[in-house]
Amino acid sequence: MQKPSLELKGSSFTLSVLHINDADLDGVARELDDKLAIAPQFFLGAPLVVNLSAISDPDYNLAGLKDLLISRQLVIVGITGAPSAIANQAKALGLALIKSGKQSQTQPQLPKTTKIVKQNIRSGQQIYAQNGDLIIIGAVGNGAEVIADGSIHIYGSLRGKAMAGANGDKNAVIIAQNIDAELVSIAGQYWLTENLQAHASIKSGCIRLDGDSLTVEALSL
């Protein structure tokens, strides 16, 4: 029997949600550029759902926002939380309207995996553990990036960038034997070098979220 030319099947994907909290596109552009500068390769071509629930202006410049994101090589999958006037703009621009809702209690969760890398991660390299944790047996050098949807464990020095909870997991942690990072991030909350310098006395530690703020605890590793 000949295989059909196409099939329509249901599926689910993890997408990042960009919350727009201010109608000022210039301000949005500045803050977005700051975030993109932190990890440009991670965000490049990233599919986004844009949440506009904080925008009440019916004449909001959605076309301008779309152009702003496209010019930075971000891909808008659709919008959510928009009032009807903005939703009509979205339809005219060919953007999908996505309904947000709570996941069913019975919906199966993706199995969590662990990616183990037994080598030093050098400048310019990026390691990503999708749908799971990342274990690095080695050092993460300056200019290197390690990213995980779950937690990150580094059995060595962390001098580059480490981004855990990349899909929004606020329970993710970053553990390293020697923390001297350019950036650490959990579920979008991040510290740069200057933030980490305030905790310079802690070398081996666990970085986690406490509410919406990062905190670091000393460990004996």
Swiss-Prot record:
Q: A Pfam family for this UniProt protein?
A: MinC_C
Does the keyword section mention Cell cycle? yes
Sorted alphabetically, the keyword list is:
Cell cycle, Cell division, Septation
Q: Name one GO biological process term.
A: regulation of cell septum assembly
- Disulfide linkages recorded for this protein, renumbered to the chain, are none
Q: Does the keyword Iron apply?
A: no
Q: Which InterPro entries match?
A: CAP/MinC_C, MinC, MinC_C_sf, MinC_N, Septum_form_inhib_MinC_C
Task: Write out the function statement from the record.
Answer: Cell division inhibitor that blocks the formation of polar Z ring septums. Rapidly oscillates between the poles of the cell to destabilize FtsZ filaments that have formed before they mature into polar Z rings. Prevents FtsZ polymerization.
Subunit field text = Interacts with MinD and FtsZ.
Regarding protein family, the annotation reads: Belongs to the MinC family.
* Official protein name in the record: Probable septum site-determining protein MinC
Name the source organism: Shewanella loihica (strain ATCC BAA-1088 / PV-4)
